[in-house]
């Protein structure tokens, strides 16, 4: 653990001591080395259980894939931001990179925390750098509105969790995840216990987000700069899923009767948000709503608590993290050239940028869960486990899969095919940096096809 945390903290010093000319190459290289070093965490499988660095930090098969995804994303965010941030004054560039590094540090400590209260503190700490990135480097004046939505939705959802954790500490005498999972099931029967159950999960359902409390996400995605969108889609939403998987195993037997309304919202949300995608004119908003749709499947899977559903949830979270981040990078390459996110104004780009169209095609096929991508493995496991839980769910999940395929192809056709506008005929060519960025997103996803058990979490 420390072999990753210490170099990450050293990256703060590197950022502030590097000469202006070498700031971006040095920070990118250093963060890429950390990402490669983090791949060693893949060796923790179920036989080995927890691997402790100390009493408060440990890795297990559930947290290892998410930790690696977090480390993998930092060099990609720095690469993606280089074009539009490198024109700013040097002090702003350093602050921007520092915020990204601090976000990675908080996320590493959140995913590896063994104490629930430490997890809660790190969960909340990620708010601060994300909020600054959105409100300071966002594209339009609506970024302040988006920042307010993001802050208040997350805070209002998180406060009941703090009260619930304090009550848990009072009852059980400990908040260690390792200790809490072994006592006898809690005898939860009163109305107060039902409120406590809801308080434990609502923060994570807002973060995922569940349909109904998802309104902050499209706003935050649309207004955030590219690095903000990438980290939000790839890792911050997964904090909600990870937190749910950690805490829901402690809340039985109440989950069996309390989960129904949330399950219905999650599965209905898959159809609703997928349908909203078909009506979008803003490219980033379309990708943001597709994230809500995918995370609805994850929320439903975690609620039913079977080995298959847990494996499907973690697999889909990792696969979606890589694919949605790649889609935001592709949307950003379009935006940097056309200065518009409107689908109608950027048609027929395949003629000018044929290789970029190939990346669009691969990313969209992965998004619609083409065999044999990890997205398909995750969705199949989730849909199968939901079908075993209730055969009626196949109608909703099946329809959701069809609409997902429809909006993915719609997004590809609207951006790449059709007659090219006159104002697009003088576009800048694609750069090696952009192709490297997309390679580093999509090649790991394709390699996971060869050994998917690396991201199956507890069940392997």
Curated annotation (Swiss-Prot):
Protein name: NADH-ubiquinone oxidoreductase chain 4
Main location per the UniProt record: mitochondrion
BP-aspect Gene Ontology terms: ATP synthesis coupled electron transport; electron transport coupled proton transport
Localization, UniProt: Mitochondrion membrane
Catalytic activity of the protein: a ubiquinone + NADH + 5 H(+)(in) = a ubiquinol + NAD(+) + 4 H(+)(out)
Domain of life: Eukaryota
Transmembrane stretches, start-end: 22-42, 59-79, 93-113, 114-134, 148-168, 195-215, 225-245, 258-278, 286-306, 310-330, 351-371, 394-414, 440-460
Keyword match Lipid biosynthesis: no
Organism classification: Eukaryota, Metazoa, Chordata, Craniata, Vertebrata
Annotated keywords: Electron transport, Membrane, Mitochondrion, NAD, Respiratory chain, Translocase, Transmembrane, Transmembrane helix, Transport, Ubiquinone
Membrane association type: Multi-pass membrane protein
Described purpose of this protein according to its UniProt entry: Core subunit of the mitochondrial membrane respiratory chain NADH dehydrogenase (Complex I) that is believed to belong to the minimal assembly required for catalysis. Complex I functions in the transfer of electrons from NADH to the respiratory chain. The immediate electron acceptor for the enzyme is believed to be ubiquinone.
PANTHER family linked to this entry: NADH-UBIQUINONE OXIDOREDUCTASE CHAIN 4
Organism: Squalus acanthias (Spiny dogfish)
Enzyme class: translocase
A GO CC annotation given for this chain: mitochondrial membrane
């Amino acid at each position: 653990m420390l072999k990753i945390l210490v170099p990450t903290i050293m990256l703060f010093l590197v950022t502030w001591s590097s000469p202006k000319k070498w700031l971006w190459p040095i920070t990118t290289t250093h963060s890429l080395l950390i990402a490669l070093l983090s791949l060693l965490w893949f060796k923790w499988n179920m036989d080995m259980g927890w691997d402790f660095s100390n009493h408060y930090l440990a890795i297990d098969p559930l947290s290892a894939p998410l930790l690696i995804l977090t480390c993998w994303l930092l060099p990609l965010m720095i690469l993606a931001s280089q074009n539009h941030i490198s024109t700013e004054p040097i002090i702003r560039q350093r602050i921007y990179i520092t915020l990204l590094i601090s976000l990675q540090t908080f996320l590493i400590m959140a995913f590896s925390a063994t104490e629930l209260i430490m997890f809660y503190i790190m969960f909340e700490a990620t708010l601060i750098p994300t909020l600054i990135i959105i409100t300071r480097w966002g594209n339009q004046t609506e970024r302040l509105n988006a920042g307010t939505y993001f802050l208040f939705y997350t805070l209002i959802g998180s406060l009941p969790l703090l009260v619930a954790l304090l009550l848990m500490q009072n009852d059980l005498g400990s908040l260690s995840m390792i200790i809490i999972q072994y006592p006898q099931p809690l005898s939860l029967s009163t109305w107060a216990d039902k409120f406590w159950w809801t308080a434990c999960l609502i923060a994570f359902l807002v973060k995922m987000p569940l349909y109904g409390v998802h309104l902050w996400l499209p706003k935050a995605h649309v207004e955030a700069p590219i690095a903000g969108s990438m980290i939000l889609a790839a890792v911050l939403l997964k904090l909600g899923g990870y937190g749910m998987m950690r805490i829901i195993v402690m809340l039985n037997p109440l989950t069996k009767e309390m989960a129904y309304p949330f399950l219905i919202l999650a599965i209905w949300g898959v159809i609703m948000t997928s349908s909203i995608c078909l009506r979008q004119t803003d490219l980033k908003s379309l990708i943001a709503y597709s994230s809500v749709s995918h995370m609805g499947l994850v929320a439903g899977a975690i609620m039913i608590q079977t080995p298959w559903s847990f494996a499907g949830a973690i697999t889909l979270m990792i696969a979606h993290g890589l694919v949605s981040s790649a889609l935001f990078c592709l949307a950003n390459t379009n935006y940097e050239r056309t200065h518009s996110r409107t689908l109608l104004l950027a048609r027929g780009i395949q003629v000018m940028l044929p290789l970029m169209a190939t990346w669009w095609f691969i990313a969209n096929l992965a998004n619609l869960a083409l065999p044999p991508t990890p997205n398909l493995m995750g969705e199949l496991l989730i849909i199968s486990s939901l079908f075993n839980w209730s055969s009626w769910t196949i109608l909703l999940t099946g329809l959701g899969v069809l609409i997902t395929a429809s909006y993915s192809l719609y997004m590809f056709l609207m951006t790449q095919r059709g007659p090219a506008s006159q104002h697009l005929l003088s576009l800048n060519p694609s750069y090696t940096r952009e192709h490297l960025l997309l390679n580093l997103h999509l090649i790991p996803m394709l390699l996971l096809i060869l050994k998917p058990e690396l991201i199956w979490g507890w069940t392997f």
